[in-house]
Amino acid sequence: KDILCVISIASHGIYMEIFQKKGNIIKIIDKAVHITQIGKEVLLNHKLTFNKIKEINEVIKSMKTAAEGYQVEKIIVFGTTAIREAKNSDYLQDQIKITSGLDLIILDKLEENYLAYEKISVALEKGIKDYNEKNNLIIYIGSGNVSFSVINNGINIYNTNIEIGSLVLSDISNKLNLSDKKRNIVID
């Protein structure tokens, strides 16, 4: 059947996509989203609370059950910046393994950026006729960082990363007691 499920634990929620491959075409056949503030909690506490770990586990188990309804061949669970930055991410990995039997892969910055750029590049290739024949700058603004990638004729030739993202900027503006107008300027 060539069906795969990918679950991403990110700063603003937990996301599931189920993909099916038919020939050379890969199609998303289902999606699910659970919104929760993981990144903000880690930014403030440097760890995940017991309740947040419990919530993440319950959502992962629920998404696994939904994916099994499609008879998926494999379920991949990965964590991004918020999970990587949590001091107790190893405990979360253990709990997910115990409760759902799934392995949580915590992506490093380079892996996370690579996947983001690949997804962006595929979208740009579809939307811009001669995308692979030009020089392009892709800026990826995440909740924990801002990344830049230079693409030359379809090949990624340079990457750099700044450790400040939307959550950090929001936290700074809160600490400075900025008005809404000034806060939006800082975050923009």
What are these regions (language model features)?
Residues 1-28, 126-162:
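Gly/Thr-rich phosphate-binding beta-strand-loop-beta motif of the actin/hexokinase/Hsp70
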Residues 122-126, 130-131, 164-166, 185-188:
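Active-site glycine-rich loop that binds ribose-phosphate moieties when present
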Residues 76, 86, 93-141, 146:
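Active-site neighborhood for divalent-cation/phosphate handling
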Residues 12-50, 153-185:
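Short glycine-rich, Thr/Ser-proximal phosphate-binding strand/loop in the N-terminal lobe
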Residues 66-94:
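Short beta-strand-loop/turn "lid" adjacent to the catalytic site in phosphate-handling enzymes
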Residues 61-75, 125-130:
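Phosphate/pyrophosphate-binding loops at sites that engage ATP/ADP/AMP, CoA/4′-phosphopantetheine
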Residues 54-66, 188:
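Short, well-ordered amphipathic alpha-helical segments that serve as non-catalytic structural scaffolds
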Residues 52-56, 109-116, 183-186:
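Phosphate/oxyanion-binding active-site loops and adjacent basic polyanion-contact surfaces
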